[in-house]
């Protein structure tokens, strides 16, 4: 939220003549400061290397499935982060789920626990990895996971469930939306951790 506020104020003050690229990572308090600076600096470089700069790289690096290359999966133009991740994916999940640390309990919302969000993230990462290999097994797995969540039709959460299935099915069709959903899930995990 702070990073977005800083970016918006800079754009306002400079009439969009100066852009900002950033690297954002979260660390435990005991993590060495020199390593924090190094990782965040690498993330900033990744953001600056994004086409046209004016980007943000989030969370850190992953090793690809071969273990050969470190990649940052969460790199966005600022407007894409705001519009596609926060105002679309995160907002939709907020409307459909009770998320500890983000919203209040409502009878019409499904409960989102850490186990479910981590499983969803694992399957989304699998879908993104599968695309490069032409496989589709994780699409089937995510649809199976959603089918197991289905409440009875007279349950007040049934409408939220139907909307969730429709949204996720639509989002996993494109790499961009799938990646944005994964980023939104990561943000939810960090919000949930913040409640402790």
Where are these regions (language model features)?
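Charged, helix-rich terminal subdomains or tails
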Residues: 1-196
């Amino acid at each position: 939220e702070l990073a977005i506020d800083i970016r918006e104020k800079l754009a306002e003050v400079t009439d969009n003549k100066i852009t900002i690229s950033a690297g954002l990572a979260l660390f435990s308090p005991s993590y060495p400061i020199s390593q924090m600076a190094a990782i965040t600096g690498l993330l900033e470089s990744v953001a600056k290397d994004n086409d046209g700069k004016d980007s943000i790289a989030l969370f850190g690096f992953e090793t690809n499935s071969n273990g050969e290359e470190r990649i940052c999966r969460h790199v966005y133009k600022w407007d894409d982060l705001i519009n596609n991740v926060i105002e679309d994916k995160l907002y939709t999940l907020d409307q459909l789920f009770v998320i500890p640390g983000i919203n209040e309990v409502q009878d019409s919302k499904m409960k989102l626990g850490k186990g479910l969000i981590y499983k969803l993230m694992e399957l989304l990462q699998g879908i993104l990895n599968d695309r490069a290999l032409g496989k589709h097994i994780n699409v089937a797995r995510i649809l199976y996971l959603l089918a197991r969540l289905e409440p009875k039709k007279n349950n007040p959460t049934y409408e939220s469930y139907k909307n969730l299935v429709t949204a996720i099915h639509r989002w996993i069709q494109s790499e961009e939306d799938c990646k944005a959903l994964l980023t939104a899930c990561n943000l939810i995990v960090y919000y949930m951790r913040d409640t402790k």
